[in-house]
Regions:
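Compositionally biased, charged N-terminal/linker segments
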Residues: 1-39, 47-52
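A general structural signal for short secondary-structure junctions and capping/turn motifs
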Residues: 33-36, 59-63, 137-140
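Short, surface-exposed beta-edge/turn micro-motifs
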Residues: 39-41, 145
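Short, Lys/Arg- and Gly-enriched loop/turn segments at beta-strand edges
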Residues: 50-68
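Contiguous surface segments at macromolecular interaction interfaces
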Residues: 79-176
Length: 176
């Protein structure tokens, strides 16, 4: 049976998740989600208090608990180095000097060197100190079946209880 997992997002910059270039990918952050979700499972990202506050500070109003994205994992999870080397995802490697924010926010940043150690491409979202956290997730999740709402995130009329039979969890990561 397919499982559904949600989490509260603290950032929404196009990095994690990365909804660009025809697939939504989750290759950084949320290591437990990336380690435990598989093909057919659902993952949902909701706004956290921190994300709502950050958006407000930048003149954007979004609701707490708003659905930012929903994805069904449509492929077997890819080990991070396999994701990095997959020609389909070369466009998801960040280019810091690019004018296009979609190119700057690429999430395809980890590969293994000849000694089997993870290396990290320069990027605008994660410093080297995030490498251990990110690579502990082992996998990149890929979806061709997704809905990304970003700043147009929403809470349905009547709240999540109407759709889910209960309120949205207050935890950072939860089963739906």
């Amino acid at each position: 049976m397919n499982k559904a997992m949600g989490y509260k997002m603290t950032h929404d910059t196009g990095f994690a998740p990365n909804p660009f270039h025809g697939a939504l990918t989750l290759a950084t952050c949320k290591p437990a989600v990336r380690r435990t979700r598989g093909r057919g499972d659902w993952v949902a990202g909701f706004t956290s208090k921190a994300l709502v506050q950050n958006a407000r500070e930048h003149g954007v109003s979004i609701p707490y608990g708003g659905l930012v994205y929903l994805m069904q994992v449509t492929e077997e999870p890819l080990e991070l180095s396999a994701y990095f080397n997959d020609p389909r995802f070369l466009k998801k490697r960040p280019s810091l000097d690019a004018r296009d924010p979609e190119v700057r926010s690429g999430d395809n940043i980890y590969w293994r060197d000849a000694d089997g150690l993870y290396q990290q491409l320069p990027n605008n979202s994660h410093e080297q100190d995030a490498k251990i956290h990110d690579t502990s997730g082992k996998n990149a999740l890929v979806s061709a079946r997704f809905w990304y709402f970003g700043r147009n995130c929403f809470v349905p009329p009547g709240g999540w209880k109407v759709l889910m039979g209960r309120e949205l969890s207050t935890g950072r990561t939860f089963y739906c």
